[in-house]
From Swiss-Prot:
Bias (Polar residues) ranges: 43-54, 82-92
Function: Cell division protein that is part of the divisome complex and is recruited early to the Z-ring. Probably stimulates Z-ring formation, perhaps through the cross-linking of FtsZ protofilaments. Its function overlaps with FtsA.
The protein, known as: Cell division protein SepF
GO CC terms in record: cytoplasm
Cell compartment(s), UniProt: Cytoplasm
Similarity remark: Belongs to the SepF family.
Naturally occurring in which organism (per UniProt): Streptococcus agalactiae serotype III (strain NEM316)
Subunit structure: Homodimer. Interacts with FtsZ.
PANTHER family, per the entry: CELL DIVISION PROTEIN SEPF
InterPro entries noted in UniProt: Cell_div_SepF, Cell_div_SepF/SepF-rel, SepF-like_sf
A GO BP entry: division septum assembly
The UniProt record lists the keyword Cell cycle: yes
Amino acid sequence: MALKDRFDKIISYFDTDDVSENEVHEVQERTSVQRDSRAATAQEASQRSHMTNSAEEEMIGSRPRTSTYNPNRQERQRVQRDNSYQQATPRIQNKDSVRQQREQVTIALKYPRKYEDAQEIVDLLIVNECVLIDFQYMLDAQARRCLDYIDGASRVLYGSLQKVGSSMFLLTPANVMVDIEEMNIPKTGQETSFDFDMKRR
């Protein structure tokens, strides 16, 4: 708790924006309540240890105790604390690995019909989703503009835009790697050859 309070004090030292008198009083009240609760807890602990010491003395009998310091007992308690910490740490690491395994990669399939749909596609890239874009329902000029916008956004967001079909592109975030072999795309009835530049060929 002391470490947490110290960090809170350090953070509050630098946080001077919008500080009011009420907030200052609330912080002071909280710290005084925390100090009081710590003092009460310490008193209870000392009373418990005193009670256990007196109970041990009664069990031992008339043999007087010269010192309350017991190095073996303190050593055992320290070892138990260390063991409990070491046992708790792998559990936390295991939970993180389970979360990563449970996360699934989703691929959104988009058929943009107008230039304004490009913003929706870029928004999906921002939240780290893969997007398969098919420009079959767009006019050639609009598709080129849309593709240029998406390509610029993917470069800014460190994404990747790859052509996977005659009118299809795969947009992936930086954390997704795609290995596409060279493939011959069959010519269909719709002749489209979008390129990343705005010039018409």
